[in-house]
UniProtKB/Swiss-Prot annotation:
EC number: 2.7.1.24
A GO-annotated cellular component: cytoplasm
The UniProt record lists the keyword tRNA processing: no
Lineage of producing organism: Bacteria, Pseudomonadati, Pseudomonadota, Gammaproteobacteria, Legionellales
Entry protein name: Dephospho-CoA kinase
Subcellular location: Cytoplasm
GO BP: coenzyme A biosynthetic process
Enzyme class: transferase
Family: Belongs to the CoaE family.
Species: Legionella pneumophila (strain Lens)
InterPro entries assigned: Depp_CoAkinase (IPR001977), P-loop_NTPase (IPR027417)
Pathway: Cofactor biosynthesis; coenzyme A biosynthesis; CoA from (R)-pantothenate: step 5/5
Reaction(s) the record says it catalyses: 3'-dephospho-CoA + ATP = ADP + CoA + H(+)
Length: 201
């Protein structure tokens, strides 16, 4: 199977921008969140399980899941978050594996927001952690989710702590300057992963 790098980091750390930079370099990127969205689209088995568990309050008028409402529930209740993770994560892992088989680039990048146990993803050779200063994260969450700073802090509080993240990481990318510096750091890592992927072959 192709050499694989897991890309992770707390919410609003700049993961998606980093993933875009790798994509611009010709690297196939698999998005765990996108897979999760597809798995929970209308009338799928996971969609049915979620409605059975949470009730009709999580369904919009058009029949789609009210993702914002579900997000609010799981951010305020760790048991509900764990239930949802235990439902989705095994299926997401399987789908990632299927996509890796058809990967055409020298190595593959997999964006997995909640990656703090490498053993759950045995096909990963490396884990790249993106971290950003707290204030930057808060600003991004407030702008993106149109929420208050207090709500943004509550969202961040549900994320794995940095120590947990660092334990799983092989490489750490600090996103604290502008985009050009971030791009330069990605280019450097890209060269490193190309070398490592070549050695693996």
């Amino acid at each position: 199977m192709v050499y694989s790098v897991g890309l992770t980091g707390n919410i609003a750390s700049g993961k998606s921008t980093v993933a875009e930079f790798f994509s611009e370099l010709g690297i196939n990127v698999i998005y765990a969140d996108k897979i999760a969205k597809e798995l929970t689209s209308k009338d799928t088995p996971c969609y049915q399980d979620i409605i059975l568990h949470f009730g009709s309050s999580v369904v919009l008028n058009n029949g789609e899941l009210d993702r914002k409402h579900i997000r609010d529930i799981i951010f305020s209740n760790s048991n509900e978050r764990l239930w949802l993770e235990s439902l989705l994560h095994p299926v997401i892992r399987k789908k990632i594996e299927e996509q890796l088989i058809v990967c055409t680039s020298p190595y593959c990048l997999i964006e997995i927001p909640l990656l703090f146990n490498k053993h759950h993803y045995p096909y990963l050779q490396k884990v790249l952690l993106v971290i950003a200063p707290l204030e930057s994260q808060l600003d991004r969450i407030v702008k993106r989710d149109h929420c208050t700073k207090k709500q943004a802090l509550a969202i961040l509080a549900t994320q794995p702590n940095l120590e947990q993240r660092l334990e799983a990481a092989d490489d750490v990318l600090i996103n604290e300057s502008g985009l050009s510096e971030l791009k330069a750091k990605v280019n450097k890592l890209h060269q490193k992963y190309l070398r490592e992927a070549k050695i693996k072959q």
